[in-house]
């Protein structure tokens, strides 16, 4: 497994194809490209193929948030998510916040994360 911190050249089309295998959606290529350019991208690759990704949005000083931690289903339970979290902790100067999907709290706690703020969402008006 090859891990990269700060993969600024992460291809938007590749990321969309990867993300759709986990969270199927109609992702916009240009918006995805813009989003990837604004985050610290940590990747896990096997044979050059993207199999895991953790993205961090940060001001570089006070606050950072993990926007997502994604690992392809067939690569889960191999330590990839744990390795990406460890790299995030080692390469981010800020405290990291994130929301966890229900049922995954144990994974995060085993990886040294602790419960913090309650999460809320403001949905865009349609």
Q: Where are the predicted features?
A:
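Conserved acetyl-CoA-binding loop-helix of GNAT-fold acetyltransferases
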Residues: 71, 77-90
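Short amphipathic alpha-helix that is part of the acyltransferase structural core
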Residues: 1-29, 119, 126
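A conserved beta-turn-beta hairpin within the catalytic core of GNAT-like acetyltransferases
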Residues: 56-66, 76
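Conserved GNAT acetyl-CoA-binding A-motif
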Residues: 85, 90-103
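Conserved catalytic-core motifs of GNAT/GCN5-like acyltransferases
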Residues: 95-99, 109, 114-126
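Conserved beta-hairpin
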Residues: 34, 39-54
């Amino acid at each position: 497994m090859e891990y990269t911190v700060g993969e600024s050249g992460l291809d938007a089309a590749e990321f969309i194809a990867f993300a759709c295998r986990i969270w199927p959606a109609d992702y916009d290529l240009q918006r995805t490209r813009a989003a990837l350019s604004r985050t610290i991208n940590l990747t896990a690759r096997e044979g050059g193929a993207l199999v895991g990704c953790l993205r961090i949005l940060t001001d570089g000083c006070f606050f950072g948030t993990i926007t997502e931690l994604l690992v392809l289903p067939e690569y889960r339970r191999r330590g990839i998510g744990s390795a990406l979290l460890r790299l995030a902790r080692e390469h981010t100067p800020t405290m990291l916040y994130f929301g966890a999907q229900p049922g995954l709290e144990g994974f995060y706690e085993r990886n040294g994360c602790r419960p913090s703020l309650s999460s809320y969402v403001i949905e865009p008006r349609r």
